[in-house]
Amino acid sequence: MRSTSRTRRRTVAIAATLMAGGLVWGAGPTAFADVSAGLPAEVSPADQAALLGDTNAIRQKEGAPPISWDEGLASGSQSWADNPGSHAGGLKHDLGFNDGAENMSSAGPSQSVSQWAGEKAAYDAAGPNWNTDDPSYRYWGHYWNMVQKNYTRMGCGAADGVTVCRYA
């Protein structure tokens, strides 16, 4: 009986310590950057310009009009990137976001667009009948999201181990 009570107290103490550590680490972007795998804890102004410029260069090649940066999409992307549920055990899309498209990458912001652009060959091979329900969509869907002509805005966020970009 005593060992059960002692174990319970230790478990509570350990949990409290871990939660307090999480609050400290979550207190600001630099705190995450110190313990990350070298990925930024948020999208810097330079990253923002590069993400937008690189995306628009790809869109231009596909005949799609340029898109603009949207702070609302960026804020939502940052919130999802900061949520441990977005990348614990693998990348997971925000099922609550249904106002456009969402791309996710375990690469940093400076590499994400080129990673998604690398799907162009699979996109071209899919032909003119793109079916987002087809299992092959995962091989070209990020590229497709970037070049959709009906999307006019984008915003991105980043945290330790994940970059999220949303398009609407």
PLM region spans:
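Secretory targeting and sorting signals
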Residues: 1-34
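Glycine-rich, histidine-containing beta strand-loop boundary motifs that form or position
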Residues: 27, 71, 158
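Short alpha-helical segments used as structural interaction elements across diverse proteins
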Residues: 5-7, 56, 117
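Short, well-ordered surface patches within globular domains
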Residues: 39, 43-100
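A well-ordered secondary-structure block
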Residues: 97-168
